[in-house]
Swiss-Prot record:
It catalyses: L-seryl-[protein] + ATP = O-phospho-L-seryl-[protein] + ADP + H(+); L-threonyl-[protein] + ATP = O-phospho-L-threonyl-[protein] + ADP + H(+). SUPFAM superfamilies: Protein kinase-like (PK-like) (SSF56112). Residues 1-70, 353-415 are annotated as: Disordered. This is Serine/threonine-protein kinase H1 homolog. Residues 80-334 form the Protein kinase domain. The keyword Kinase applies. The active site is at residue 198. CDD domains: STKc_PSKH1. Residues 41-50, 386-406 have a biased composition (Basic and acidic residues). Residues 363-385 have a biased composition (Low complexity).
């Protein structure tokens, strides 16, 4: 049986507030300064009744808040004032709340206890164990017969790549700073026997809007905890573009799958493109099985050899040959940071690639909605967003993949 996640997706435009799950107490004032109009709807541009359109966004938002407030357990609403709906998933909703006494802002994830059982049990079990500077913190949990309410810190800095697009510059030095934080958190998790299994840019959030903000690892719905030294995982789960070859090959696997994902993230971080990219799942998975990627393109000429070496030591088919989190932190590219990492501004290329993929993905989605034909599997490498909230690895598609003769040959070559 495959893992399924209630990955959160943005509800819609709401200022510059991203779907976020982390925050820390001392940032409350900064949060309020950054979001002074969080609960205000747009002004009515005209009072002419004939120009009246749909209710203002603020009114719709208030109705949604009331709708979800009514669904919350009284114990929760007695302690927390629900302010806004900020995200939703397959079996979950996330709201921004304020502690009624301290006025601290938090996020509460409300999960359907039956449909989201696998997700909440995994996430709660992990978050109750961890306490790390670069990992989301669970504050408390309320449970009823039908629902689970997870109270978590709230981050206000947005997703990793949103910040890069908005930032005026981005260098390898900036990339190594981000990766040092991510790897420090991953090393901590692996030391506890915890494998995240869904590391990707959407799950790396900035702590606050400031330029010196740290990165936080979030969303542990697919995570797994090792029961013993030889305890392997076998569940087919993850996000297609970030999944490791051993999962596709249906081999027993361990925490090295997270390091493969870090390699994919690093590649994207330095180029704004994915190392393995194809709309057709079979072709995509075959690229991953062979670790078939390249540094083609003008933008890669500006990336140092050390950075490419770092990626090459992570995107290795054999898990045993992949860098561990501890070893990755010792790689010369990360250690030297300012000394050896290139200071060339990569921002223009990266942001253009990210924006292009996001805009073409949006246009592609609109086109798909206007036609009944959904059977085409033609590759569309330039038209796919880096966001992957609804793209999950499904066990049945891996079953079908293994019936393909070409894939069988690829698997045989892996041994």
């Amino acid at each position: 049986m495959g893992c399924m996640s209630s990955k959160l997706v943005p509800e819609g435009p709401s200022g510059n507030q991203a779907v976020v799950e982390v925050f820390n107490n001392e940032r409350n004032k900064e949060y309020n300064r950054q979001n002074p109009h969080q609960n205000r709807g747009p002004r009515d541009p005209t009072k002419d009744p004939k120009n009246a359109g749909p209710p203002p966004e603020g009114q719709r938002s208030n109705r949604k808040v009331k709708k979800y407030r009514d669904k919350f357990d009284p114990r929760v609403t007695a302690k927390y004032d629900i302010k806004a709906l900020i995200g939703r998933g397959n079996f979950s909703k996330v709201v921004r709340v304020e502690h009624r006494v301290t006025k601290q802002p938090y996020a509460i994830k409300m999960i359907d206890r039956v449909q989201g059982k696998e997700v909440f049990e995994s996430e709660v079990a992990v978050l109750r164990r961890v306490k790390h500077s670069y990992i989301i913190q669970l504050i408390e949990v309320f449970e009823t017969k039908d629902k689970v309410y997870m109270v978590m810190e709230l981050a206000t800095g947005g997703e990793l790549f949103d910040r890069i697009i908005a930032k005026g510059s981005f260098t390898e030095r900036d990339a190594t700073r981000v990766l040092n934080m991510v790897l420090d958190g991953v090393k901590y998790l692996h030391g506890l026997g915890i494998t995240h299994r869904d590391l990707k840019p959407e799950n790396l959030l900035y702590y606050h809007p400031g330029h010196d903000s740290k990165i936080m690892i979030t969303d542990f719905g697919l995570s797994s905890t090792r029961k013993g030294p030889e305890n392997f995982m076998r569940t087919t789960c993850g996000t297609p573009e970030y999944i490791a070859p051993e999962i596709i090959a249906r081999k027993p696997y361990m925490c090295q799958v997270d390091m493969w994902a870090v390699g994919v993230i690093t590649y994207i971080l330095l180029s704004g493109t994915m190392p393995f990219d194809d709309e057709n799942k079979t072709r995509l998975y075959r690229l991953i099985l062979k670790a078939k990627y390249s540094y083609a393109g003008e933008h890669w000429k500006d990336v140092s050899a050390q950075a490419k070496d770092f990626i090459d030591k992570l995107l290795v088919v054999s898990p045993g040959d992949r860098l561990s989190a501890a070893d990755a932190l010792k790689h010369q590219w990360l250690i030297s940071n300012a000394a050896s990492s290139s200071n060339k501004n990569l921002h223009r290329t990266i942001s253009q690639n990210l924006i292009h993929r996001q805009s073409t993905r949006a246009n592609s989605t609109k086109s798909a909605k206007s036609t009944r034909s959904t059977k085409s599997n033609k590759s569309n490498r330039s038209g796919r967003s880096l966001r992957s909230e609804h793209r999950r690895v499904m066990p049945d598609e891996i079953d079908e993949l293994h019936r393909d003769p070409d894939v069988q040959a690829d698997l045989a070559s892996l041994g």
